[in-house]
């Protein structure tokens, strides 16, 4: 069975084709980073217009890459939420229209379920059950996963997501958008211990996160210590260490609470090398395993949507003729497969 996946939830247009026997047959991606860089963040209207321009050509490119035609596609999956409503509507409209024209099922996919299942695309996929750390620009969540659609929210950010805090702090340090990866690169040149940032909400029970205060702490540290290159690098190092330590502490608690031996990292921030190294070290000490997708599948992409669509299609999920999206869509509302 072959599923075409369409991802347009934010500022990446991702198209992929997944075969349940052969794996990933095609993967096309267009990033709008340069388009939004001058504005310091994603402009929803510009994102939607660019998806309109790029989605169909990328579908054609994916078919060409795979050597397939429309007749070879068994279902069309598209991101139905959460995300920017205009951007979501582009992918949903194209996906639903193609499914109708090709006379195949249309499968609405939850964007965060796509991220959560992205490590399943690797050669050594995780088995259930596991604790999932979904960490991106829009979400920071700890989830108990016992099967497809069997998701229990253990904790989440009560304000800024970790990725959002990275980008905002990077902007304070004078870095371009998107600043998260640039901040991490700068942090690698920083001196550990010169500045010590707090580890928010680790001094109390629970699995929720709060990262907005770290941005304020960074702003005050910059104000009080100047902006020479080494100071900026030291501040970046202190900030990244604080975020990584906070995530690690909460992951430990979640693993203790569930008793699970497997940890899955997903979302854009899961590509962070420091976070990967620290969590890998932690799981080795616990005699457990950590899983994550390759870096290009940590950020938004069509491959994860094609795979999640295939899983949902096998479980009997389909869409009606209407085109509907959900900009806000709790993961816990998904049915079990």
UniProtKB/Swiss-Prot annotation:
Gene Ontology terms, MF aspect: iron ion binding; N(6)-L-threonylcarbamoyladenine synthase activity
Keyword tRNA processing annotated: yes
Cofactor: Fe(2+)
Positions annotated to bind substrate: 134-138, 167, 180, 272
Biological process terms in GO annotation: tRNA threonylcarbamoyladenosine modification
Keyword field contains Flavoprotein: no
Amino acids binding Fe cation: 111, 115, 300
Protein name (record): tRNA N6-adenosine threonylcarbamoyltransferase
